[in-house]
Design a protein with these regions (language model features):
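N-terminal "pre-motor" subdomain/linker immediately upstream of P-loop NTPase catalytic cores
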Residues: 1-87
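Switch/coupling sub-region of P-loop NTPases
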Residues: 69-79, 90-168
């Protein structure tokens, strides 16, 4: 959440807009606020769970898509999805998780924030303010016997080390 009285520090937040229309879907709004010389600047993203695209609809060339599917369906290993803001990392990750999500597969995610809620997935939102860091979450995951772990961000060496251990 955000503290609206704090205008000196960058902040992240989220709200859900409830669609009251018949058959409407709720929309999550994620936002980031930064202080600038001329006042606060905000960037907002609108997210709908129904917008999780299938893997074959996200624009990966077919040859590369086959390699990606083979990698995410592998029982071991690590797949890194990298790129600048707005390049499709989140879209790719969620499409990949959706592709392999089956009731018998234990999938755990560590995210900041959880951008789309997915049925059957153990999603945990990191919260460094209370000590719930990516490395803390990953250590807990290792005791949950997951087949798949998604880490939204790798911010430090400790998280790298645990992620590599989990991938082996």
């Amino acid at each position: 959440g955000c503290d609206i009285s704090e205008q000196r520090l960058p902040q992240d937040g989220a709200i859900t807009i409830k669609d009251q229309s018949q058959g409407g879907k709720d929309t999550d709004v994620r936002f980031n606020v930064v202080p600038t010389k001329y006042g606060e600047r905000i960037c907002m993203r609108l997210l709908r769970a129904s917008n999780i695209m299938p893997l074959d609809g996200i624009g990966i060339p077919e040859r590369d898509l086959k390699k990606f599917i083979r990698a995410i369906e592998s029982p071991q290993g690590m797949v890194l999805v990298t790129g600048p803001t707005g390049s499709g990392k989140t879209t790719t990750l969620y499409a990949g998780i959706q592709h392999i999500n089956k009731p018998e597969t234990n999938i755990m995610t560590a995210e900041d924030p959880v951008e789309y809620t997915m049925t059957g997935i153990g999603q945990i939102q990191a919260n460094e303010t209370i000590g719930l860091t990516f490395s803390t979450i990953l250590r807990a995951f290792l005791r949950q016997d997951p087949e798949v772990i998604l880490v939204g961000e790798i911010r430090d060496k400790e998280t790298v080390d645990i992620a590599i251990k989990a991938a082996l």
